[in-house]
Structures are given as C-alpha cells and as structure tokens.
A protein has these predicted regions:
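Conserved donor-binding/catalytic core segment of Leloir-type glycosyltransferases
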Residues: 17-18, 188-216, 225-226
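N-terminal strand-loop element at the rim of the active site
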Residues: 19-78, 90, 167-169, 230-232
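Nucleotide-sugar-dependent
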Residues: 30, 206, 255-262, 269-291, ...
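Membrane-proximal helix-turn-helix segments that form the acceptor-binding/catalytic region
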Residues: 37, 84-91, 106, 119, ...
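Conserved acidic donor-binding segment of nucleotide-sugar-dependent glycosyltransferases
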Residues: 311-312, 316-323, 332-337
Length: 376
C-alpha cells in the first residue's frame, strides 16, 4: 500500500525512501514506529526491506515490504548480499536510502549511480563488537579497528544521523542527532502496586539473570515481574526455565505499540544494564518509555540513566548487578504510595516536555527531504 498523500501541500514533492535493515527486528521502535511512521505521516512513500520471514512478522500496510534474510551471528554475508541486490534493483526508483546496520555499509559501497544514502548510527559500533559472544576474543581488536575505518569512510561518502549526542566524538563533522524518544501519551494511569516490568532486548549484559533473581526475591511479597522483549540465544533456556517454575512472566517480542500498553499501571520499570563500554554513552530508551507511561524507574548507574533519573527525580538508582537492592527499591515504592505516584508523575511531566518524539520527528523529516533534494 503506498502511503502517498504528498504533493497536495503547495508543491512539496513526495519522496520515495528505501529503508533497509538485516540486523534489527522489522518492528523495531526507532526504525518503524518513529522514523518510518514520521515519513509516512508527512506524505512520503516508504519501501521497507527487513527480515520479515526470519522474524515471523508481516510488513505493515502503510509500507511496501521487501523480505531480506536476517544477519544472525556469523551468517552475515548472505544477508548483506541480498540487501545489495535489493539496493541495486531499486536505486533508480527511490530518492533516498536509509540503512540502519553497519553491515549494510558493505551493501552500498561501490554501487554506481546510487541515490543519496543515509546511515542511521544506532550504537557505538566498535564498542558493541567487543560484546558479541560469537566474535572470538583474538579478533576483537582488529575488528574494532576495521569498524573505526569503516565509520571514517562512511562519513566521507554518506549522510549520517546519530542516535546519541555522545556518538558525535567518533566523527569529524557535526551530524543531526535523532534521539531515541518515544510517543508520550496525553494522559497516563497512576502506577499500581503488584507488577514490575522490563521492556527491551534481553541478554546477560542487559541484566537478564538479575531480573530472574529479583522475581524470585519478590515472589513472597506477591509482586509479579513481567519481561517483554526478544532474548538472545544464550538467555532463552534460563528464561524458559524461570517461566516453567512460575517465577516470572516473559512475553517475548511484542510490537512496540502493544508492548508500551503493558507499561500502564505497573509499579515500576526496570533497566538493569551492566557496566559495558557500549552502554556508557547511550541513553537507555526504556527509561524514557517508562517515564512516558508515568511509572517510576529502577536503574543501574549507567551515566546517562543516572543523569535522567536524578535530574527529574523519577525513580531509584541501584548498584550494578545487585538483585537484592532492586527488590528493596521495588518494595520501597510499593509501600510508599505518595513517593511512587510523585516519581511517576515527575517522570511523565519531564518526558512530555523533553522527550516527546513528534518534536524531533519534524527535524528528522525535514533533513531527509533536504537530502533527497526536496525543498520543504
């Protein structure tokens, strides 16, 4: 279905954008629910190439879906080759291409007569590579070095968008920051007293073991722990075991719009990241999402998380890898209704004022229109 309603507003030409990912889930909140949605709402047409079959989902009706293989662990080249084919086939039909994975730099390099290409930098690529369990330790330093070279080349030949201000230091020039904000609802329900939630990717480095331990500690107090998100292969067996024992609820992957509804009325939202290089500079999106839904945040002390929670007094900061402290924070918020309501309300007000996606969406769309050669 073409999302075209574009040229009615006084000469602004409709842009056709090709968006590609082989790493992210097709329902990724940043890619689909924020960026693509903003382009479609502005009257542009989007073809979205992503691993639909591999992830067991259908393309939304408001994009043209193209199926790609998923780049999983070491099987990345087949996915990159497939993306390169799509890119070559469509290069004459689209005005602009947006790629979301460093791997896809290899899909666009050296293709002649290509439209402008935008790389949306989601993470600290060199630091992230040191976290990949499938990459042997001896390969990590040379791969990190190659990643830096690749980033330098990308900056010379492509347009860049950054998900974090903190990533700017890796590049020579200034680039537009499109922050990981969220849709902040017009009103929210006050936080309840019997359920804590975790929303996001689940892995060891993101605190999956601590979350399970917290659930065990809270069982006698009848506070349920609900995890929502895709888990990496290393964590799945442990999670399945915990679910079988009745320790917690794990809802696996849910589309972002459905997952966010699960935050309403929770007692608190958890962010249990470990102290890893990739997490030091990035703003955990889930914290903004918890605040946007009016629930207090319980987070480990990664610098950006502390900055948010302490600035707005919207939750509790707990030590690294300390399930007992997390459980105590949950019980403190459960027992002190005034404090729970106040922290939830302050977080909501701050999110509404400072982290509401439509405010950034306008800048994002205008920048893409400019790169596609359209005057808005």
């Amino acid at each position: 279905v073409n999302a075209s309603s574009g040229s009615s507003d006084g000469g602004l030409r409709e842009v056709h954008v090709l968006v590609m990912t082989v790493v992210h889930h097709p329902e990724d909140a940043r890619i689909l629910h924020r960026q693509i949605r903003a382009l479609v709402d502005a009257g542009h047409e989007v073809t979205y190439a992503a691993p639909y079959t591999a992830r067991g989902v259908m393309a939304r009706s408001w994009v043209n879906g193209v199926d790609l293989p998923r780049a999983a662990e070491r099987k990345r080249f087949a996915a990159v080759r497939a993306a390169r084919k799509v890119f070559k086939r469509m290069r004459g039909e689209v005005d602009l291409v947006v790629i979301h994975d460093p791997e896809l730099l290899l899909a666009v390099v050296g293709v002649r007569k290509r439209p402008p290409v935008v790389w949306d930098v989601h993470e600290d690529t060199p630091a992230t590579l040191s976290l990949k369990p499938w990459l042997p330790a001896f390969l990590r330093p040379p791969v990190r070095f190659l990643a830096r070279l690749l980033e330098g080349a990308a900056e010379r030949h492509l347009h860049l968008l950054l998900a974090e201000t903190a990533y700017a230091g890796r590049f020579r020039h200034a680039h537009l920051v499109v922050p990981n904000e969220t849709w902040v609802p017009d009103e929210v329900t006050p936080p309840g007293d019997d359920r804590v939630v975790y929303l996001g990717w689940l892995s060891g480095a993101r605190g999956v073991r601590e979350a399970i331990e917290v659930a065990r500690l809270l069982q006698p107090y009848r506070v349920a722990v609900e995890l929502i998100g895709y888990a990496d292969p290393q964590s799945r067996p442990t999670l399945n075991e915990a679910v079988a024992e009745g320790v917690l609820e794990w809802r696996d992957f849910m589309p972002n719009d459905e997952a966010l509804k699960r935050l309403d009325g929770a007692l608190a939202g958890l962010s249990l990241l470990h102290d890893e290089p990739n997490y030091r500079h990035s703003m955990p999106t889930k914290i903004v999402e918890y605040m946007a839904h009016g629930i207090p945040v319980i987070t480990t002390p990664s610098p950006r998380a502390v900055e948010l929670v302490e600035r707005y007094d919207s939750g509790v900061v707990v030590p690294w890898q300390d399930p007992k402290a997390v459980a105590q924070a949950v019980l403190f918020l459960r027992d002190d209704v005034r404090e729970r309501y106040a922290r939830g309300a302050r977080g909501y007000a701050a999110a509404r004022a400072n982290h509401h996606w439509p405010n950034s969406a306008r800048r994002f769309v205008a920048q893409l229109e400019a790169w596609a050669g359209v005057k808005s």
